[in-house]
């Protein structure tokens, strides 16, 4: 989240860092400042607290099953570098980088946040076709 907001004013970055620090310590933040509710609303805080307990690279190392790491090249929330770190931690995993795919598994020609949000909010846009075919192939191969 902090990476995603790195272009925001320092006061916003500091506020986000403070909230994240509390959540990482397992503490709920009852009074989220105006404008931060979408990211840190009360209903999502328990999930975030549980999420911060895990190191994805460590977790993936421990898996004893076939792993497919799927990453959209136009995802503005989880970066290609994050997927590459997972692959490095689990060399036997399959890494699938998909052109134009964003965080909600749809095609988006840009990483512009406003255009991404329009794609996020458009239920008529289909899931990326490469994802569907690749996921199907991976499952069939591993049966």
Q: In which residue ranges do the predicted regions lie?
A:
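Accessory cap/linker subdomain of secreted extracellular hydrolases
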Residues: 1-50, 54-57
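Solvent-exposed, polar/charged alpha-helical surfaces in well-ordered, non-transmembrane soluble domains
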Residues: 58-61, 84, 88, 133, ...
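Short beta-strand/loop motif that positions the catalytic acidic residue
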Residues: 63, 69-71, 75
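Short alpha-helix in the alpha/beta-hydrolase fold that links the catalytic acid
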Residues: 65, 78-89
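A structural signal for isolated positions on well-ordered beta-strands in alpha/beta enzyme cores
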Residues: 68, 94-96
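Catalytic active-site module of serine/aspartate enzymes centered on a nucleophile-bearing elbow/loop
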Residues: 94, 101-143
